[in-house]
């Protein structure tokens, strides 16, 4: 079994579960750490829908929770939240939790091709039924496309240099493994002062491209509002600035009453306020949690409540 330490576990689930007999969604089931805690907070009348796009996570989860009657585990990307809830004949929910990014299961299994610390095929698919792999991105995208992805999704200042080197190397032979890509990046990018691996940002960028992560988040957040009851909550844990920015802007937009230009004296947009932001500043892990689980260091939790 893979080691899995859920991030901001008590903080996120305490905000999420306000009614023990309510209906909740764990939109990023993973290895079930948050789901387990949510179920502990629910009464026998409460119900949890757990969603994940990773089939392996679903199979492990079904085995782990096979004796539990008030959870339904579904294989689906969270961007199809509406289809999942409609299929289950659920009209409204009391809360939804998103724990974004790559899971421990995906990172810790070398053959999944997510980690720059392993030597395995460049895969990076969260859903193994999807077609696009990291190999395709690295070996088939143009230099301009690679540069854009690495710059935008990795926020990497050396994007141009890395893209150029990828194209140069792949002309000699395809880049097939995580180690090859890691070594390539390390050969052209100086090591940061904090000692972290220079490949980190590029691997993040390629992973986001392969899985369409940012667009999925935007779609899922919009859909979640439609299903939330009044008083229901959206809790989102993000791990890098791109994710956090999407969540922050989404919460801000839906917490505004009017978006008309300031020089218009009377509101004509007709926009209604839908959310109250409960976390003015994001909640971050304690020093103790970071010491216990290094992967939690960049986590941020934001919470909003449906009006």
Curated annotation (Swiss-Prot):
Methyltransferase: present as a keyword of the record? yes
Localized where? Cytoplasm
- Per the UniProt entry, the Enzyme Commission number(s) are 2.1.1.199
Q: Which keywords, in A-to-Z order, does the entry hold?
A: Cytoplasm, Methyltransferase, rRNA processing, S-adenosyl-L-methionine, Transferase
Superkingdom, taxonomy of origin: Bacteria
What does the entry list under GO cellular component?
cytoplasm
Q: Name one Pfam family in it.
A: Methyltransf_5
Q: What is its main location?
A: cytoplasm
What is a GO molecular function of this protein?
rRNA (cytosine-N4-)-methyltransferase activity
InterPro entries reported in the protein's UniProt record: RsmH (IPR002903), SAM-dep_MeTrfase_MraW_recog (IPR023397), SAM-dependent_MTases_sf (IPR029063)
Q: Which reaction does it catalyse?
A: cytidine(1402) in 16S rRNA + S-adenosyl-L-methionine = N(4)-methylcytidine(1402) in 16S rRNA + S-adenosyl-L-homocysteine + H(+)
- Positions annotated to bind S-adenosyl-L-methionine: 32-34, 52, 78, 99, 106
Q: Which GO terms describe its biological process?
A: rRNA base methylation
Q: Which HAMAP family match?
A: 16SrRNA_methyltr_H
Q: Which family does it belong to?
A: Belongs to the methyltransferase superfamily. RsmH family.
User: PANTHER family, per this entry?
Assistant: 12S RRNA N4-METHYLCYTIDINE METHYLTRANSFERASE, S-ADENOSYL-METHYLTRANSFERASE MRAW
Q: What does this protein do?
A: Specifically methylates the N4 position of cytidine in position 1402 (C1402) of 16S rRNA.
Question: Know the name of this protein?
Answer: Ribosomal RNA small subunit methyltransferase H
Instruction: Tell me the organism.
Output: Caldicellulosiruptor saccharolyticus (strain ATCC 43494 / DSM 8903 / Tp8T 6331)
What is the name of the gene encoding this protein?
rsmH
